[in-house]
């Protein structure tokens, strides 16, 4: 609403999505480590009049400038950090599995997963709910890389089913993703247990030093 031309209502954004124009420069500085919005043309808005969260997609949503500032994360409550980093992880996983993935997007998915999982492991091993803060820049980079990946390849069933939980029941988006993630992966395994899912299992298993994870 701040940068859109001649628009003062959320509904107008959706009515004019195909022809949305910017009136001002859009500069994005992430304040969580989940959305990757600084590198995508997607914004998720809670349309309270409809009781749903809906994506707004337009070239006008691309940032003109963006900066990753680790200090912006340091005052985050732990639950906000946790759920937003889960969102980034799911972006990386779903984009990796996407039929629209390519070799380049897979590189960003894999790097995002490596950063998220290695930093989670270190934070758990070294104690306390604030231990993640020393990895603030790595979590921002992971969110950025996952944003690049899903901006190209898209997301899938986990996100699709998580949106109603947020829009109707007001469950934080990352938590909604977490609630859906394992069951969706298990269903994928039932439907097609070979191919990219095997590669993902090997990737996650190596990062976590465990047997296949689903």
Predicted segments, located by residue:
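Glycine/threonine-rich beta-strand-loop-alpha-helix active-site module
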Residues: 1-71
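Gly/Pro-rich interdomain helix-loop hinge
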Residues: 168-214
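Re-entrant/interfacial helical elements at transmembrane boundaries that shape
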Residues: 44, 159-164, 180, 198
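A general structural signal for well-ordered alpha-helical segments in protein cores
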Residues: 86, 113, 158, 177-178, ...
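Glycine-rich flexible loops
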Residues: 90-93, 101, 114, 140, ...
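Glycine-rich phosphate/pyrophosphate-binding beta-alpha loops
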Residues: 34, 145-174
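Carboxylate- and glycine-rich phosphate/diphosphate-binding segment that chelates Mg2+/Mn2+
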Residues: 42-153
């Amino acid at each position: 609403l701040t940068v859109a031309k001649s628009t003062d209502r959320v509904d107008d954004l959706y009515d004019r999505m195909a022809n949305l124009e910017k009136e001002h420069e859009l500069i994005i500085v992430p304040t969580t480590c989940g959305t990757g919005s600084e590198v995508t043309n997607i914004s998720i808005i809670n349309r309270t009049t409809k009781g749903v969260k809906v994506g707004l997609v337009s070239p006008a949503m691309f940032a003109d400038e963006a900066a990753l500032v680790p200090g912006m994360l340091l005052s985050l409550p732990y639950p906000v950090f946790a759920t937003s980093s889960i969102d980034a992880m799911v972006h990386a996983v779903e984009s990796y599995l996407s039929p629209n993935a390519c070799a380049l997007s897979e590189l960003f998915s894999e790097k995002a997963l490596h950063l998220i999982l290695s930093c989670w492991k270190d934070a758990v091993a070294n104690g306390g709910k604030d231990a993640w803060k020393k990895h603030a820049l790595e979590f921002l980079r992971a969110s950025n890389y996952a944003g690049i990946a899903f901006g190209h390849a898209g997301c899938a069933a986990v996100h699709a089913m998580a949106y109603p939980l947020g829009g109707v029941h007001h469950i934080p988006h990352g938590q909604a993703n977490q609630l859906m993630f394992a069951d969706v992966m298990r269903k994928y395994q039932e439907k097609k247990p070979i191919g990219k899912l095997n590669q993902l299992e090997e990737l996650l298993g190596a990062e976590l030093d465990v047997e296949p994870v689903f």
